[in-house]
Structure formats: structure tokens, C-alpha cells
């Protein structure tokens, strides 16, 4: 995810999802977005999971890693065989993106890995990085070839808007990624995950001088020490309901990582139709 420095710079966690996306046909990917609220806030890019645990192989089979030509930089979630959802701020003009599904340990090749090239990136139509890098921070990525689904490569469940909002209010969610394991530290080689509590909106608003729009939510621990961080952007915030995991948020941004009194900021999936 992206972090915001106290010099007024916001860092992304590499980062968020789509507002009012009407995803009725994966081949057409017709998207309907809300209007962007303008902001003069300035941002810089970053993101990851601090204070988390090593995930078991196949524990989060919807998780993917986004690779540029040099290194990995963001996460994402499998929507179906041909589409991945991530944060819009992860998309850079002219940068070739490779999606790696079935990844667990980034330091060695694994038989569960599947690599696909991104042939089309579709940010939410109201997303405008020059106005606000994290408002409506959500995008879809179309893959060149379908993924082969199995126990290590599986789409995340996405409920309708009403139920997604209800699930989010259950209170706790899981975030995952290969981002930094401590603020400004090294990135994880093994997929990390962390259980984070939802933070009430009033507390969320008081915790930062930056604008928290209605399509964002806060999650994390007041005491600090546990958080998503740089490199985690675009990855999932999921809520488990009777043994089934549903996508409820997209890792977007935050102020540094795991700081006391600060929280991770996520795109609220219930604001968008997939």
C-alpha cells in the first residue's frame, strides 16, 4: 500500500478498487463510476503487511502478485479466469505488467505459479491521479490467457453491494501481501497475512489530516505494530463469513506503516458493483 509521510506526502500501498463498477460481462468489462471529488492533496507511491504471519501455501488462492519489468510492486485479487482487480494507483502508463497467480515464496520458482501478461488495464472511470491518487483507487486488469483454476488459483467471492457492506461491518478482515514487513524495511518473500479490525468512521477521521471519502474505510490497531504497508497496495481485504471469504476492501494508502494512532486506508468495495 502507499504510505503518507508527515511532509504532507501520501504513500500508496500499491493500491485500491472501483466505484460503481457494473461488471456484467468479463469480455466487455463495462464500468460505471461515480464522479470524483476533487482534492489538492499531493501523494507519493509506496505499500505492505507489518506484524503479520506467514501464510500457508494455498491459504489465499485469490491473491496475485503484480510484476513490472524489474520487480514486483503491487498485489491484486482474482475475479475470474481472465480478470484481476487491483488498485488504480498501481497502474503506470507504459509499464508492462505481469500477473503471477499461485505465488507463495517469491525467492524460488514454484509449480503452483501461473504467469499472465496484462493486455488491458481499466481504472475506474472517475479515477484521476492528477487530482487525487487514492480517490476511487480501483482498477481491473484483463489477462492475455485464462488462468487455470485449482486449489492454489481461485477467484475471490464478491457479494452484491448490500451484503458486501454488511460483511464489512462484521468487524474483522484479513489483509495479505508481499509488502514490507516493517516500515521502510525489506519486502516479504513469503506471502504475509494479518487480521485487522474495522475502525469506526469518527475515529478514522480524527486520525489523519487527509480526507477520508465515503468510498474509503480504516482498519488496523490504535497501538500500532500491525498494518498493511508498501508493496501491499491493490491486494485484498477479505471478510470470512461461515467459512467463505468475500472481498470487502482494496489495500490503498496510509501514513507510514503500523504507526500508533494511524490506520490503513482501504477502498470500500461495497461502493462499487462488480
Curated annotation (Swiss-Prot):
Recorded catalytic reaction(s): these are:
Selective cleavage of Arg-|-Ile bond in factor X to form factor Xa
Sulfotyrosine: residues bearing it: 23
Q: Where is this site: Cleavage?
A: 13-14, 48-49
Q: Which cysteines are joined by disulfide bonds?
A: 74-90, 204-218, 229-257
- Glycosylation, residue list: 25, 35, 37, 40, 128
Q: Where in the cell is it found?
A: Secreted
The protein's matches in Pfam families, at most eight in alphabetical order, are given as:
Trypsin
Q: Which PROSITE patterns match?
A: TRYPSIN_DOM, TRYPSIN_HIS, TRYPSIN_SER
Q: Specify the domain of life of the species encoding this protein.
A: Eukaryota
This entry's Enzyme Commission designation comes to 3.4.21.22
Q: Which PANTHER family has this protein been placed in?
A: SRCR DOMAIN-CONTAINING PROTEIN (PTHR24264:SF65), TRYPSIN-RELATED (PTHR24264)
| Name of the protein | Coagulation factor IX
Organism in which the protein naturally occurs: Ovis aries (Sheep)
Q: What is the lineage of its organism?
A: Eukaryota, Metazoa, Chordata, Craniata, Vertebrata
Gene field: F9
Amino acid at each position: 500500500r502507499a504510505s503518507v509521510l508527515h511532509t504532507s506526502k501520501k504513500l500508496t500501498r500499491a493500491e485500491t478498487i472501483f466505484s460503481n463498477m457494473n461488471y456484467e460481462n468479463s469480455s466487455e468489462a463495462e464500468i460505471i463510476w461515480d464522479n470524483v471529488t476533487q482534492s489538492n492533496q499531493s501523494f507519493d507511491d509506496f505499500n505492505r503487511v507489518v506484524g503479520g504471519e506467514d501464510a500457508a501455501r494455498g491459504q489465499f488462492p485469490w491473491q496475485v502478485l503484480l510484476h513490472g519489468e524489474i520487480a514486483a510492486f503491487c498485489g491484486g485479487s482474482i475475479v475470474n479466469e481472465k480478470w484481476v482487480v487491483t488498485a488504480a494507483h498501481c497502474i503506470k502508463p507504459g509499464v508492462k505488467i505481469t500477473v503471477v497467480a499461485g505465488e507463495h515464496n517469491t525467492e524460488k520458482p514454484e509449480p503452483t505459479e501461473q504467469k499472465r501478461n496484462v493486455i488491458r488495464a481499466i481504472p475506474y472511470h472517475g479515477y484521476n491521479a492528477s487530482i487525487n491518487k487514492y480517490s476511487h483507487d480501483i482498477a481491473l486488469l484483463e489477462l492475455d490467457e485464462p488462468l487455470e483454476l485449482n486449489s492454489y488459483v481461485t477467484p475471490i467471492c464478491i457479494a452484491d453491494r448490500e451484503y458486501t457492506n454488511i460483511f464489512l461491518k462484521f468487524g474483522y478482515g484479513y489483509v495479505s501481501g508481499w509488502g514490507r514487513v516493517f516500515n521502510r524495511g525489506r519486502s516479504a518473500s513469503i506471502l504475509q497475512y494479518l487480521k485487522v479490525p474495522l475502525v469506526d468512521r469518527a475515529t478514522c477521521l480524527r486520525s489523519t489530516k487527509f480526507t477520508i471519502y465515503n468510498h474509503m474505510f480504516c482498519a488496523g490497531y490504535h497501538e500500532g505494530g500491525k498494518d498493511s504497508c508498501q508493496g501491499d497496495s491493490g491486494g485484498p481485504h477479505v471478510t470470512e463469513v461461515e467459512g467463505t471469504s468475500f472481498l470487502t476492501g482494496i489495500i490503498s494508502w496510509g501514513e507510514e506503516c503500523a504507526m500508533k494512532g494511524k490506520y490503513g486506508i482501504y477502498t470500500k468495495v461495497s461502493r462499487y458493483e462488480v
